[in-house]
Amino acid sequence: MKEYGSIPRFFDDGTLRGEQVVAFNKLDGQNFRVKYTPKGATKKQFTMFGSRHQYVDENTEGFGDAVKYFKEHYEDVLREIIVNNSGKKGVFNGVEEITLFFEWYGDNSFAGFHQDGDTLRLALIDVFLKKKGYIEPNTFIDLFCKDDRVLTPEVIYIGKLDMDFVNSIVKNDWTKEGCQYPNIKEGVVIKRSTLMKGQRLPMCKVKTIWWLEQLHSRFPKEMWDKLE
């Protein structure tokens, strides 16, 4: 099962500047992944669960509830979407393995840490097809974001990536009345609108000053790079 890679910061990697992109609200939680097997002995089954780097199950501390949440809310829904789009011209046609990536988060989660008593939920953030790469953003939007049964990050921007948009995110403070993006706390994940050669889908992230200041006030300096 594929692991979700680290997303570079825009100010460290400006590859996408000037490209046609789609930007999604960056939800603040923990990465969770699920493997789906379309063929073979485990045909049309979700066969494996994991955090970013480890396999988990319903008894795993911290992620057992995420597995249970997935089975209750998403197992049938996502299987239906995949099966319905596995025909001759479907995006999942001929794919031997699918990894679905989620964010496990609550309203008060911060830097991947959850607040006791908070209600946690899973939002689908990416889908990877073995040997084909990530699903392109517009396909992701059509298949999942437009389906009310699937929680996904809000689409914030579609267009050419320029500094006006980047700076609008950096300066956004959701705690202030009249801010441009009241739902954005941490920042955005920006994805190229189409795959490049080699099934590559470049991505980058932009964080808000508000979030970075909160990080620096809550955690020791030696943790900043890891959590940013």
What does each model-found stretch correspond to?
Residues 1-228:
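Core nucleotide-handling region used for phosphoryl-transfer chemistry
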